[in-house]
Amino acid sequence: MNVKRKATLKFGICIGLLCVSFTGFNSLFGSTHAEAKSIENTKMTSCITNQKFVQLEKKFDARLGVYAIDTGSNKTIAYRPNERFAYASTYKVLAAAAVLKQKPIEKLNDVIRYTKEDLVTYSPITEKHLDTGMSLKEISEAAIRYSDNTAGNILLQQLGGPKGFEKSLKQIGDHVTKADRFETDLNSAIPGDIRDTSTAKALATDLKAFTLGNTLTTDKRTILTDWMRGNATGDELIRAGAPAGWEVGDKSGAGSYGTRNDIAIVWPPDRAPIVLAILTKRFTKDAEYDNALIAEAAKVALDDLK
């Protein structure tokens, strides 16, 4: 075999592996022509979708992690699904879910008191209730709907601190997410630092377990998803990239190095829901994030799942 032919062959194999389009394997598994054509079209769509994510990274000069699960068809969309990103405030919905798992619903009415010294930057709800305290339900709602950082810290404290939160995720099968610090230190997002990081796949899988699986009882799942549907910080994110008429419940996050994240449940009309996690980061500490990157990545993923 000459060198030119060998190089061409290697290139062809690489392309075949990248787009997973070896139709020659169909006969080995007894696929009909129609089935083979359907499988090939699905795989080629995934390859095209992958390239769209590459282009978004170039357009926004950012790094992107995406994982989507269509719970009706079990089809997944994945782009850098196992790469670590700072999770930022997305943890708040998972921490609230873990608290729901641990406590009877009536305990959500327990009043939690805190002091001025407990307040951290960006606590728009908890700072208004220093004199009276807030119920655990109100604190959870403040953390999810308004991304209140003091509320987030209180949820972590309810779980035994960041490591208690990490343990609660391990109990549902997540051995990837690393939780180490409270607000607001957890948003530092220093490249190479695995503290307070996760992956798009891990976060999407956790969210699916809490909102659509049997980890929580039906009444607790309803409480959690109602909080997510009322999120006031996500209108420019996954919600902006979803088709008209598709309902979105989400939890956003932001941090240093242009970190901007959103994890969501998406309810298309008359179909099973879709779980979607989009994590992004840039390359300098003071880089600004761009909400449009999340919205456009969501559109790419959800269009592929239409």
UniProtKB/Swiss-Prot annotation:
InterPro entries referenced in this protein's UniProt entry, alphabetically: Beta-lactam/transpept-like (IPR012338), Beta-lactam_cat (IPR045155), Beta-lactam_class-A (IPR000871), Beta-lactam_class-A_AS (IPR023650)
GO MF term list: beta-lactamase activity
Gene name per UniProt: penP
E.C. number(s) listed in UniProt: 3.5.2.6
Family annotation (SUPFAM superfamilies): beta-lactamase/transpeptidase-like (SSF56601)
Family recorded in the similarity comment: Belongs to the class-A beta-lactamase family.
Paired cysteines (S-S): none
Role noted for this protein: This protein is a beta-lactamase with a substrate specificity for penicillins.
Catalytic residues as annotated in Swiss-Prot or TrEMBL: 89
Catalysed reaction, written as an equation: a beta-lactam + H2O = a substituted beta-amino acid
One Pfam family matching this protein: Beta-lactamase2
Binding-site list for substrate: 251-253
Name this protein carries in UniProt: Beta-lactamase
An annotated GO BP: beta-lactam antibiotic catabolic process
Organism: Bacillus amyloliquefaciens
Leader sequence residues: 1-34
Keywords from the UniProt entry: Antibiotic resistance, Hydrolase, Signal
Top EC class, one word: hydrolase
Keyword Hydrolase included in the entry's annotation: yes
Signal as UniProt keyword: yes
Further remark: The class A beta-lactamase family has a specific amino-acid numbering system, sometimes called Ambler or ABL numbering and often misspelt as Amber. A multiple sequence alignment was used to derive a consensus sequence and then the consensus was numbered taking into account insertions and deletions. This allows use of identical numbers, e.g. for active site residues, despite differences in protein length. UniProt always uses natural numbering of residues, hence there appear to be differences in numbering between this entry and some papers.
